[in-house]
Amino acid sequence: NGKLCPKGYLGAYLLYDPDRFKGPMKRTNPKKGRNEVPKFVPVSWDEALNTVAARLQALRDKGESHRFALLYGRGWGASDAGLQGTFGRLYGTPNGSVGHSSTCADASKKAKRVLDGNYDYNAYDYANTNYMLIFGASFLEAFRPYNHNLQVWGHIRTKSPKTKVTAVDVHWNTTIAAADRALLIRPGTDGALALAIAHVIMTEGLWDRNFVGDFKDGVNRFKVGAATLKPEDFNEKWTKGLIEWWNVELKDRTPKWAEKITSIAERDIVVVARELATTKPAMVLFERGPT
């Protein structure tokens, strides 16, 4: 829309940020966990490089060089990526060049290619949604198209009715701070949360019958602890394999089960599931890697 992304203007803030790393940092607290402070302290480049070299040599001496992985982020040129891959082969690991795309949005493209043959990113009608459930998508930090997202955010958060936002992530960030509800989740457990949300929608009869279909007699048989359901008892419309999915995976994935895995309270999972199912139109965002 003829606007420039504000990231360029804000770049100076990164340069002069008092918390910006100016060199190597070493962790001094060996204990790890959500409530542990790592206690990083600055060290010299000589100490940092010698430490890394010693650990790499120790792995190779034990015949375990394959346990080393080298990950790099966005912005590396082709020559840099090639150098990293060569380093991995010389060292003796197949994990020597794990790039940004491997851990970010390319997973969504590959998933879409398997599902519908479209090897591209999703497009969303942000302007007309009334509910957004965001799974670690970094909507206000880096989600594409970033400039458009900032513009549409102002619209959806000031229109009537105001778009309600629930954000799921592993750390406090801009999107979490701006959302109506923040769910801080244990890393890598997004799937458990999604299953529990779906479980609530099915057991409470909140699914979209015009799109999904319904039981032939209109009686909801999605119940906790229910026996295996028969696919022929359900008139399925635009989805495929719902009953099989329930039988194999979904029937025991309660919010109580998910709470132990995700660290998100059972009551919060139930509330989000109900909001998502009853606020129309609604959308679920993901893409930039699992949280």
Predicted regions and their residues:
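N-terminal export/assembly segments and adjacent metallocofactor-ligating motifs
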Residues: 1-207, 218, 257, 265-268
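Domain-level signature for respiratory redox metalloenzymes
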Residues: 183, 187-291
